[in-house]
Regions:
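Exported/periplasmic cell-wall-interacting domains
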Residues: 258-411
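Charged, low-complexity interaction regions
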Residues: 43-53, 66-75
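LysM (lysin motif) carbohydrate-binding repeats in extracellular/periplasmic proteins that recognize
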Residues: 146-176, 219-221
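Intrinsically disordered, low-complexity
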Residues: 94-99, 105-115, 121-129, 170-172, ...
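Primarily a LysM-type cell-wall glycan-binding module
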Residues: 123-159
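Loop/turn positions that initiate beta-strands
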Residues: 148, 178-183, 332-335
Length: 411
């Protein structure tokens, strides 16, 4: 059975003289492999400082760090990484943030692996489908960040994916947006141009839509969640299928190709990972009919990968989102996986466009082409008199940030 835990995003081997401090003992670590090795030897870090800006971003995505459940605490220029489950770790040293003899360069803040969610954020609440048949749902909002937030923290809190919030907020520091920074929460969406039943996953959008069957005299609703999809070379299949099985507390049996891939990166996997916090597919999974059940909708123990192309072909979800969806879904629920990078809609006499990065047959992402945009706009406008703002349309295409914009008006 193919199952697809998030793929670690790893930095290149970096320059020497970076110090990994473990129980007060310096240890040189010049690559992710060495860091993973240190973890596998049961070292637990007081703190770590790196001179390479991207390095902590890389380890935040690594399987080893996710399994150890590191959190950022403190407000030092180099934030503290503390292994919370290790009772042997005593009080934080006074010099935390700048290892003795190490670098004092600023370091990106690492994403917290679990975020306490209070209430039901608007992006996760069921949304009534417009009575007039319009495909436009939801609304955009703006919030002010707190000093300890990362964009990944905010994304998870508001039902967004990582890439979604990053592209919607260009110029905002991913790891340290700062106190009071205005953050756009893109909640206004154009529904995918397919039948509104069951589960629909739009791969370029990294988003799942669930259309529950309404009871008699009940207003139809949609519930939408961010998802991770297949990475470059391991694309998620397209087409129609159904949920053929639901499994709670699953074990993970990685295929030989997945094990070979991890081994080549110095991250060997066992043949079986049982249920629990170390299981990369989480506490629930729903098997799809593709390829004899080879693909699944499952959870993750690396939530920062949600909303990105990061799996071996499956659909990954935040644990709390999958738990909610799992309770709503029955075996036999139809599932449609589509590749629609550009969505259009008419609303109040204006032509709206929502553009995302296109995904090719191999899972590679790129800006959608002008021809794709022109075809979609032509199809939408052919039965109406409309003035298209082409410069605006091209700008929206180039940004491909998923934020709805007006590109035309009726005349």
């Amino acid at each position: 059975m193919l199952c697809c835990a998030p793929v670690s995003i790893r930095a290149q081997v970096i320059t020497p003289a970076q110090i990994f401090v473990v129980h007060g003992t310096p240890r040189d670590c010049t690559s992710i492999t060495q860091l993973d090795s240190a973890l596998s030897d049961n070292y637990q870090p007081f703190f770590a400082g790196w001179s390479e800006q991207d390095y902590v971003e890389a380890i935040a995505w690594s399987r080893a760090c996710a399994n150890f459940g590191w959190h950022v605490t403190g407000r030092s220029r180099i934030p503290l990484l503390q292994a919370q489950h290790d009772k042997a770790i005593g009080p934080v040293p006074a010099h935390v943030g700048t290892p003795a003899g190490g670098t004092s360069n600023p370091m990106p803040m690492r994403v917290s692996p679990d975020i306490a969610l209070s209430g039901e954020p608007p992006s996760r609440a069921p949304l009534k489908l417009p009575a007039d048949g319009s495909p436009v749902i939801g609304s955009d909002t703006t919030i002010a960040s707190h000093y300890q937030d990362t964009l990944f923290d905010i994304a998870r809190r508001y039902g967004l994916g990582g890439e979604e919030i990053i592209r919607a907020n260009p110029g905002v520091d991913i790891w340290l947006p700062g106190e009071g920074t205005r953050i756009l929460i893109p909640g206004r969406r154009i529904l995918p141009p397919v039948s509104r039943e069951g589960i629909v996953v739009n791969l370029p959008e990294h988003r799942l839509y669930y259309f529950p069957k309404p009871a008699k005299n009940e207003t139809p609703v949609v519930i939408t969640y961010p998802v991770s999809v297949g990475k470059d070379g391991d694309s998620t299949p397209l087409g129609q299928t159904r949920i053929i099985a639901k499994i709670q507390h699953p074990s993970w049996v990685p295929t030989q190709s997945i094990r070979d891939d991890h081994a080549a990166r110095g991250d060997p996997l066992p043949r079986l990972i049982g249920p629990g916090p170390d299981n990369p597919i989480g506490d629930y999974k729903m098997r799809l009919g593709f390829g004899g059940g080879m693909y699944e909708i499952h959870g993750t123990n690396a939530p920062a990968t949600v909303g990105m192309a990061a799996t071996y072909g499956c659909i990954g979800m935040y644990p709390e989102d999958l738990a909610a969806l799992y309770a709503l879904i029955s075996i036999g629920t139809p599932v449609r996986l589509i590749n629609v990078p550009i969505k259009v809609a008419w609303s109040a006499g204006t032509l709206l466009v929502e553009a995302h990065l296109a995904i090719d047959a191999h899972g590679r992402a790129a800006a959608p082409s002008f021809d794709q945009l022109a075809d979609v706009l032509h199809d939408s406008a052919q039965h109406a008199r409309v003035s298209i703002l082409w410069e605006r349309a091209v700008y929206v295409l180039e940004r491909a940030d998923g934020v709805i914009a007006t590109v035309g008006k009726g005349v």
